[in-house]
Amino acid sequence: MIGDMVRGLVTTIKHVIQRPVTIEYPEVRRPVQPRFKGRHWLHRYENGLEKCIGCSLCAAACPVEAIWVEAEVNTDDERYSPGERYAKTYEINYLRCIFCGYCEDACPTEAITMGHMYELSLYVARRRDLHQG
Amino acid sequence: MSETVTIYLDDRAIEAPKGMNLVDACKLHGVDIPVFCYHPKMEPVGMCRMCLIELGFEQRDRTTGEVVLGEDGKPLVRWFPTLQTACTQVVSEGMHVRTTTEAVRRGRKDIIEFILTSHPLDCPVCDKGGECPLQELTMDFGPGKSRFLYDEKIHLAKRYPLGEQIYLDRERCIQCARCIRYVEEITDDPVLQFYERGRRLQIISTSEPGFDSKFSGNTTDICPVGALTTADFRFGARPWELDSAASICTHCPVGCNLTLNTRLDRDAGGRVIIKRVMPRQNEQVNEIWICDKGRFGHHFTAAPDRITTPLVRKGGKLVEATWSEALELVAGMLKSAGKAVGALAGPTLSNEDLWALRRLVEGQRGARLGVWPPTMTGGDLIAEVGVAQGTNFTDMGKGACIVVVASDLEEEAPIYWHRVKVAADRGATLVVVNGRATKLDRYTRHRVRYHYGDEVATLNGLLRQALGDAAPDIDGFDQLRAALENAPAVDAAAAQAIAGATDLVVIVGGEGLSMAAHGALMQAAANLLVATGHVGRPNNGLLAVWPGANTQGALDMGFTPEDATHIIDNAASFEALIIAGADPADEDPRAAAALQEAGFIVATALFLTPTAELADVVLPRMSFAERDGTFTNGERRVQRFCKAIDRVGESRADWQIFQQVGAALGQGRAMPTPGVVMAQIVERVPWYAGMDYPTLAEVAPQFPMVGGEDLYYGGTMYKNAGGLGRQWAVAAEQASYQARVRVPKAPAAPKPGKGELIVVPVRLLYDQGTEFYKTQLVHRRVPQAYVALNAGDAARLSVREGARVRVRLAGTEVEVAARVRASVPEGVALLPLNLGVGPLPHAASVGTVAVAEAVGA
């Protein structure tokens, strides 16, 4: 009978002495692969000006039409990017985004890249957005 | 052009009209030859070298002229040793062309590579990117890689304003000179030129203000690269992101076909707005051109001061109300007004609006339907001898004669001017009959000048001279002959030109004319056409330069300018007035006071105009971009326009409003769509028979075949998929037509006394019209209010250029700046309308001009 009990617990005991495969998220975070495609980042030059020129090629490349860009003319008083054109509006709809990374490929100025951040369900922000007003 | 020649295109025999350009001929047979500098509407120059082909001719025996045959029995072809430019060739019998050989491919590749050595390739920030001929041809024929070092590229000014409206990017320019040729050859505003040479060759504007042309926007369409772009659309959107809707311009009677490109904009509160206005090809109306007023004058649709809700007068003030409240009030007031109901319809009401308004008024047994502004008349004559169906300025050349009377066409209807001018270039004879010099004078020897007030006598004189002793058998001719006895001899050469013309079109404007005088002038013009037998055939007949985009439609729907004058003159007798999309209080000095007398006034308006401020109920109407409908242009072509943007606020279309009021009055159910209203028009208005919406939306192949896959051929233009419209036939085209002339009854000419001048109000293209002036971009082109005087008169009145003067005419007095111009005839003062100095009379009258300080002293 004891033999039967031991035989029945073999798998359990084996797992007791093995290292656990789960990690204690969010206290512990597992690193992602270097080329992981998470949240997008729009980058700036070292002098603080935006790399994005509002050309909308990312939006054109986007297979799910998640990106919305509106361009405007830089003036000397109000300058966002080095050239004449900048993105007045830049929106990514994360409900639509499929993280394919085509936007990154399309960008002529390397302004948009996909970062490692994957925590996109922001409960507080979402709640505020939903309930305000 | 019926004669054809046979040419061999890639060893395939094709027929092409004799004298046709080789690029066009190939295009006609489905072979695209890439071009940059060649444009089907302009003379070829062979500058860009992109259209290289292999060219050969069949050998002919020098003694006999026979084609030499080879051993295989086929003609021997002598090929040019080098590649030739196709655009500089005209098709001729026995021409052999090869467009697909290795040599041709190589030649095109090298030309593209060469052009790109000086091109910045900044396509991501270029407004042309996505619809750029250079981009497309590089993808099709380019090398894919440049051997040229980037650092050796030439760098020139990138954002150079040629004027306020057009920006030039000198790096992107490939020196095809399409823009320079367009303004020099076609619009004759030689304001652009090349400057410097070699790789620094660049375009400059030589005028002040820069790029001073009324057609400057067209150069941005025909520019094969992003060198010329409009300030209006600067970074507005990428072309592939735009939606488009077919529309019709509302600024003048030409009825240019437009495409409204729209896109959502966060700055506009997430609304869809018009991003740019592009011409839509209609070879019978505007070809591929539009004027700058049409291109840039669309901002009123999104102006922040649009009326968004119905307004009802309570306690002397207009306060916001709901639609049901306002409509109920209007219906109640109309009911109690009984028969004493009148309507004034504005210039941009669609045919559906007009029909619904007519039904509403007639349903109440009202009889007065006025079309605003009541400056021109003669709709009956247009219906009798208007330009016949199929009339097209593009078909007019040698043998045709175009008479322009009492109109500064470039200011009043720029695309008429454009097409008349090009017809004159093709050899059409132009006779310009006017009281003063206009730009059209440059293209003719026949400039007939009259004293203001003698317009009718002048046309009568021309007719007498043109007829000579001939006595056509026409009803009423004997009386007319008797009346013509006293007509002055005017210009024998011009009369000769009219008499000798195979085709004759008379274009009648209304400059300086009262409505009665205009009616007489229209009759005189009709007589000229009928007596010389130029009616009822294509390219013959009468054309009026109406004051509004849909004045013709209003006349067709039974509205008359005579009723409009009657309403203003007898406003007190109207218990209820419906003023739809019109602004009499701002345009007629008598109207503001007269409207105070009227009973209940309901106005539909876009803005709180002076007329709307006088109204008891103001209803927000939709602009042309927010709804569907049809307009009828000056040539009686009924054309559809479609909804492009969402309505502003709670605005409704005029036809909806009138139908809803009618429904409340028990006139029957409101019709659901404008198409249904049109169906009713088709049924009841005989001229419009068969013009239902699907018919009006039909398209047919047009030449040149612009748009589609080959933006490089005609410029940035898209195929017309919105319809070409239909022109209705006039009485003279019917077999039952009885030619008839009548004696025109001209009112007496104004006779200035000592110290007095004839003050002639004139229309300018760039004015402070409520709708046009909402476009900020054009403000610098709208002049300060002025009066133009002859140097002699100015000296006599001691008026200097720029001095403030008081102008008095017909009970109105305004203070404006003086301009001294040699083009103004002696004894005449030209006073432009609509420049923000309040309402002015439209007819020429005796008046005075005096220095302002002197009056005060």
Residue ranges and their predicted role:
Chain B
Residues S2-G19, D24-K27, V35, H39, ...:
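N-terminal export/assembly segments and adjacent metallocofactor-ligating motifs
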Residues I33, R358, K398-V404, E410-K439, ...:
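A cross-kingdom feature strongest in bacterial/archaeal respiratory oxidoreductases
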Residues L228-R234, A268-R276, A343, R368-V371, ...:
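Acidic/polar loop patches that form or flank catalytic/metal-binding clefts of enzymes
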Residues L327-V341, F393-G399, A492-V505, H566-E575:
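Glycine-rich phosphate/diphosphate-binding loops that line cofactor/substrate pockets in enzymes
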Residues G366-G379, L430-A437, A531-A549, F600-T611, ...:
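A generic structural motif
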Residues G435, R442-P472, H518, A525, ...:
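Short alpha-helices
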Residues A499-A571:
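A glycine-rich, hydrophobic/aromatic-adjacent loop/helix-cap motif
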